[in-house]
Amino acid sequence: MWLLFAFLSALFAGLTAILAKCGIENMDSNVATAIRTIVVLIFSWVLVFVMGVQNGIFHLSGKTITFLVLSGAATGASWLCYFHALQIGDVNRVTPIDKSSTILTMILAFLFFGETVGAVQICAMVLMGAGTYLMIQKKETETGKKTKKTWLLYALLSAVFASLTSILAKVGMQDVDSNLGTAIRTAVVLVMAWVVVFATGKQKTIHGIGRKNGGFL
């Protein structure tokens, strides 16, 4: 069953990248992140109530809350970096780097949780890293242009924070339903995203968002 959910996660992650690229066109990426997080928050809490696990929020330990908040903060940082990278870079280059967080997550899981990393896993990580590098290089060769590498920095930061999200969530989700944990983490992301929007003074641009942008977001 976990394999099915993993495949679905990959599918929706791919759709997210395409839809987000369309949605953030001609608008601030931080505002876009804040708006789409509202949708995610509503969806996640609807799922919590549908599953009937909302009462679990009253039984969370201090440790669980702490790691869920930290995981949410890492998620927020990852999303903000990721969508800014998408805005200024190509999807074909940003997405592979972002998804390379899997490699870092496997390494951190081995270091902190003692999870097994055998020869097959090591070979897989090497191949994933090589594939990511080749995809980036191929795209640069095809364009034949030298572009600013700002997108690369944000894409790398997105991958690092995404990896930290997985590790922190692993600890925070141990004593809580995954749907409830996701909803709590998303609430943290929402607060963080809007703080960034107001801190950068971009809230004034919300009124200029078109229907196309809003629909894709």
Language model regions located:
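Hydrophobic/small/kink-forming positions within alpha-helical transmembrane segments
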Residues: A10, G14, I18, W45, ...
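Hydrophobic core positions of alpha-helical segments in small-molecule transporters
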Residues: L8, I35-R36, L70, I97-S100, ...
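Juxtamembrane helix-loop boundary signature in multi-pass membrane transporters
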Residues: M1-F7, I103-V160
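Hydrophobic/aromatic residues within transmembrane alpha-helices
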Residues: G23, A32, A85, L111-F113, ...
